[in-house]
Amino acid sequence: MSRLRTLFLLPLLASLGSCSMVVLNPAGDVAEQQRDLLMVSTALMLIVIIPVMALTIFFAWRYRQSNREARYEPDWDHSTHLELVIWAVPLLIIICLGAVTWMGTHLLDPYRPIGRVAAGKPLPPDVRPLEVEVVALDWKWLFIYPEYGVAVVNELAAPVDRPISFRITSASVMNSFYIPALAGQIYAMPGMETRLHAVINKSGDYEGFSANYSGAGFSGMRFAFHGLDDAGFQAWIAKAKDSGGKLDRNGYLELEQPSENQPVRHYAAVDSDLYKAILNMCVEPGKMCMSEMSQIDAKGGLGMAGIRNTLPLLYDKFARRGTIFGPAPSYVASICTTEEALAASKADQSATPMTSTPIVGAGLQRPLPLSIRLPSPSATGTLRSPFNS
């Protein structure tokens, strides 16, 4: 029977061999520091967990009913030494854990530029980070390289030992950008920009994906991340430039349409202001950018005239989530002149009736004219117009 159990467990153990331990065996310095922080925190917590588990088993065995040699002290209720151990050890662990976590949180702040390439390898003073603009779409990833003027869908590459500066946003709902081998995950939100600084230290092919549910195609939001040497990275950029095609605003509006499991796509050129337009939610022609709107609001706004030139503002253009709690928010479509605003105001106030015929219901007679008899001025005094001073 024991041999059959062993044979039954062998396939299960073999299946575990295919599991990736990328979180505990990363390829980037930031991810390695996060791994170390995780291991230290776990070790500190095990100082409490292991003795508690061991003592639970020990007391259950030591003071079992059949053990007549165990001491029986029903009136025992206090021990100063035991109280000191019970409270002092967890308190010291919490202090150490808090200090380690606080320092690690600030050192690994994703908005903070990295200060080294790897452990014992400082950052060269003349190195310039690789800028990558990341856009989360439904349901794919767009990566723009402003330094090289190329854009790629569902594929990312970076040279080894060169710092990477990610600028991340979303064109639809809230999402999450995560490459376990490189660094921790960070959110991507529409109309907002998050930052991530990291570096890849080992050549290889890794996987990135969305770590935040975002709809029907969420499971297919995966992309390949390549860590390349300088020559390999330049060849990858050259391949993107040779692919042809330009990603302009019209092309982007077609690309952002919801689609699932999209193949890798390269663009040899990209509109230099495309990412800013995506971030400010003004890719559509004629739409006012959020940055322009905020500048107008900072100077006092447009007043009542501004409410006449609005169109629906849709964060999720294709599903319109969240509108059940009220009308959809709006944005200013254009700026009118003073004359145009006054003309629009007068047009709204004028109401010319289409017909003066009284409304008569089915089978009802025409209503009789209503007469009101006003009191004479001699009885009430001179009537004063509300417009007279």
Residue ranges and their predicted role:
Residues 1-52, 59:
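Hydrophobic alpha-helical segments
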Residues 51-54, 75:
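Generic alpha-helical scaffold signal
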